[in-house]
Amino acid sequence: MFGCLVAGRLVQTAAQQVAEDKFVFDLPDYESINHVVVFMLGTIPFPEGMGGSVYFSYPDSNGMPVWQLLGFVTNGKPSAIFKISGLKSGEGSQHPFGAMNIVRTPSVAQIGISVELLDSMAQQTPVGNAAVSSVDSFTQFTQKMLDNFYNFASSFAVSQAQMTPSPSEMFIPANVVLKWYENFQRRLAQNPLFWKT
């Protein structure tokens, strides 16, 4: 039903079922993992109104599991990428794996998936720094940066009559900055990653 992928490692598709509605994947040598992908295999969908809460567990200094909610997978969003590199310290959160008798070893973390009602999942709050930045947030940042630059540069605009001749300084016409701004916005709207080519 589920798969788990870590860069540079084989895909895991044999989750250990620890309860009727709970599954775990072992992540050996978890200290070297930055991101993990959790996905549905496409063979069995969730029942109507259900989804999977995805948790990350690592052993604390006493070897006790610390569980943190990463996010969710659903029939409508069958895969998700989570950043776990910053989660290996900190406090755990409420989780459904507490009473489970799951075999653990010191350098092994786990990804847990709990099948739950979509309504109850919507009321849970994943740990903040588990989400991977998306193109949308990058696009928003770029748009804000463009606006800020244009507003800053425009605040220095003067007409030719107001200019004081200064042979050592170069001046850029405001319409050139506006043309660049509009061109950059157009290209960003067409392809948010155009600047990489």
Swiss-Prot record:
Effect of residue 141 to A: Decreases nuclear import activity of HSPA8. Does not affect the dimer formation. Decreases binding to HSPA8
Disease / disorder: Leukodystrophy, hypomyelinating, 13: An autosomal recessive neurodegenerative disorder with infantile onset, affecting mainly the central white matter. Clinical features include early feeding difficulties, global developmental delay, postnatal progressive microcephaly, truncal hypotonia, spasticity, and variable neurologic deficits, such as visual impairment.
Impact after mutating residue 97 to A: Increases the nuclear migrating activity
InterPro entries found in the cross-reference section: Hikeshi-like_C, Hikeshi-like_N, OPI10
Region of interest (Flexible linker region involved in nuclear import of HSP70 proteins), ranges: 124-134
Induction per the UniProt record: Following heat-shock treatment.
Entry function: Acts as a specific nuclear import carrier for HSP70 proteins following heat-shock stress: acts by mediating the nucleoporin-dependent translocation of ATP-bound HSP70 proteins into the nucleus. HSP70 proteins import is required to protect cells from heat shock damages. Does not translocate ADP-bound HSP70 proteins into the nucleus.
Biological process terms in GO annotation: cellular response to heat; Golgi organization; lung development; protein import into nucleus; protein transport
Keyword Cytoplasm attributed: yes
GO cellular component: cytosol; nuclear body; nuclear speck; nucleoplasm; nucleus
Molecular function GO labels: Hsp70 protein binding; nuclear import signal receptor activity
Note: 'Hikeshi' is a traditional Japanese compound word used for a firefighter, smokejumper, or troubleshooter.
Chain ranges passing through the membrane: none
Localization (cell): Cytoplasm; Cytoplasm, Cytosol; Nucleus
Organism: Homo sapiens (Human)
Pfam family, one: Hikeshi-like_C
Region of interest (Required for F-X-F-G repeats-nucleoporins recognition and nuclear import), residue spans: 18-55
Protein name: Protein Hikeshi
Record-stated family: Belongs to the OPI10 family.
Keywords (A to Z) from UniProt: Cytoplasm, Disease variant, Leukodystrophy, Nucleus, Protein transport, Transport
Subunit structure: Forms an asymmetric homodimer; required for binding and nuclear import of HSP70 proteins. Interacts with ATP-bound HSP70 proteins. Interacts with NUP62 and NUP153 (via F-X-F-G repeats). Interacts with HSPA8.
Effect of residue 55 to A: Reduces the nuclear migrating activity
